[in-house]
Design a protein with these regions (language model features):
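Bacterial N-terminal signal peptides that target proteins for export
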Residues: 2-13
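Calycin-type beta-barrel ligand-binding domains and close structural analogs
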Residues: 27-44, 51-159
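C-terminal motif of bacterial Sec signal peptides marking the signal peptidase cleavage site
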Residues: 22-25
Length: 159
């Protein structure tokens, strides 16, 4: 019984860690692209909750090209940084002094009710890169490789 309880706690811990990973792992010094590659997508706006009901996210427009994301007490700025036909987003932590970036790929279900996020692995795209051009080149080169992405985190729309 103890073993199964420990396994359960590990699974819960992993799930919580993965939900936090997409936004709290802002490790990069530069954005994917220095500016948005397209306007915001209105279907992404709204209140979302993780499938385990432990993580909340609110996505609002800042302007025509940029989102403000409220994620469990923290604020982030996000915009589309599409590369190689892949819907990447550049996410900047607005709460920290260093204002670092996270890179994610996103997918919205056809009905607009489910959003999945996968962070870009810093094992493929090094945290040491200091220019957006190199980031774009590496994302283009590795876009079809599964090891580019971390675990998928899913949210559903509340309203």
């Amino acid at each position: 019984m103890i073993s199964s309880n420990l396994d359960w706690l590990r699974i819960v811990g992993l799930a919580i860690g993965l939900c936090s990973l997409a936004f709290t792992s802002c490790n990069y010094d530069v954005p994917i692209t220095p500016s948005p590659t397209r306007n915001i997508e209105k279907r992404l706006l709204g209140d979302l909750i993780s499938l385990d009901h432990k993580e909340n996210m609110k996505v609002r427009p800042l302007d025509d090209n940029t989102y403000i994301v409220y994620y469990d007490g923290d604020l982030f700025r996000a915009y589309h940084s599409d590369v190689a036909g892949t819907p990447f987003a550049t996410i900047q932590d607005l709460n920290s002094n260093d204002r670092k970036y996270a890179y994610v790929v996103w997918k919205l279900s056809d009905d607009g009710k489910h959003l999945s996020l996968r962070n870009v692995s810093d094992k493929v795209i090094s945290k040491e890169i200091k220019d957006s051009g190199t980031v774009v080149a590496l994302l283009t080169k590795n876009a079809s490789k599964p090891e580019l992405f971390g675990e998928e985190i899913e949210f559903k729309k509340e309203k």
